Amino acid sequence: METIKEALTFDDVTLAPNYSEILPSEVNTSINLTESLNIKIPLLSSAMDTVTESSMGIAMGQAGGLGIIHRNLSIEEQIKEIRKVKSKKVLVGAAVGASDKELKRAQKILKENLDIIVIDTAHGHTKKVGNIIKKIKKLRPKKTAICAGNIATAE
């Protein structure tokens, strides 16, 4: 007979408040993603089609985080989503794939004043991803950060 393991979700757990001499308003949660890219809360929304389009990007930006517009859109649709977020004067990122055909997408979305471009791949520790990073570095404005991943190896 198989044993059923216990599992919990966020609704099952409560953090018990404790005495503190620090007020929440005195806490600084900001982080530097790069030397020039700072966010007020250390949260980025996932570049998934069920998670981040303009409404989530705007909400994340207004809260102090960063939304990454997913790449499962046409290039034109992705640009529209980026522009909607940028119109609210908040930070925004956008995802591209790791293939050479995605360089066309990268070239076009990099003209949209992105704060960060994300190379979205299941396995980022590959020669192909390294090569696409080099190509995007040559295309991007200096102020646009590059993020590549996912990487789960120790190297």
What role is predicted for each listed range?
Residues 2-3, 7, 13, 51-155:
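Alpha/beta enzyme core
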Residues 1-43:
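An N-cap/entry alpha-helix motif that binds or orients negatively charged groups
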